[in-house]
Amino acid sequence: INHHEFMNKIPMTAEGYTKLQYELKKLTSENRPKIIEEIAEARSHGDLSENAEYQYAKEQQSLIEGRIIDLESAISKAEVIDVKSVEGDDIKFGATVEIEDDESGEKQQYQIVGEYESDIENKKLSITSPLARGLIGKTVEDNVEINSPKGLKSYTILSVKYI
């Protein structure tokens, strides 16, 4: 595999890949037809230049079509990685990492995932985020310093798992 081809690939967990496929299916089978109906409905109300409903529906359509293009592109470039088969103690894509904030003692656990599947509420951290970039390549008991919006933060890595 040449380097250029690999650069175009987007690493993704199987769960993340399935989620993107589901979102794409929902957009193409539900949202797209619905917005086309709304545009037709708004159009039937006459003068389009003064028609806020029509303008709004067209904007929504543009957002939906943009997202569909993004998703199709991401799915076509996806390199699905079986996280359970990753070996080693150092942090790589897919790792579930427990860290401790050296200042507050607060413990947090994150899984490092692709940028299309990041979801902070569910502790899915984008591989492109400053924290994930700081963690990659490190291992248990390593200390990591990250520039955050709140200044320099220091963390200790408590565990690294591939689950």
Predicted regions, residues:
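Short hydrophobic/aromatic patches at helix-to-coil boundaries
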Residues: 9, 160-163
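Amphipathic alpha-helical coiled-coil segments
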Residues: 65-79
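Conserved NTP-handling cores and scaffolds of large molecular machines
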Residues: 24, 28-31, 75-79, 139
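Short intrinsically disordered, low-complexity coil segments enriched in acidic
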Residues: 1-3, 141
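N-terminal cationic and glycine-rich segments that engage phosphates or anionic surfaces
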Residues: 3-69
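Residue-level signal for pocket-adjacent positions within structured domains
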Residues: 7, 22, 43, 49, ...
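Non-DNA-binding regulatory cores of transcription-related proteins
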Residues: 81-161
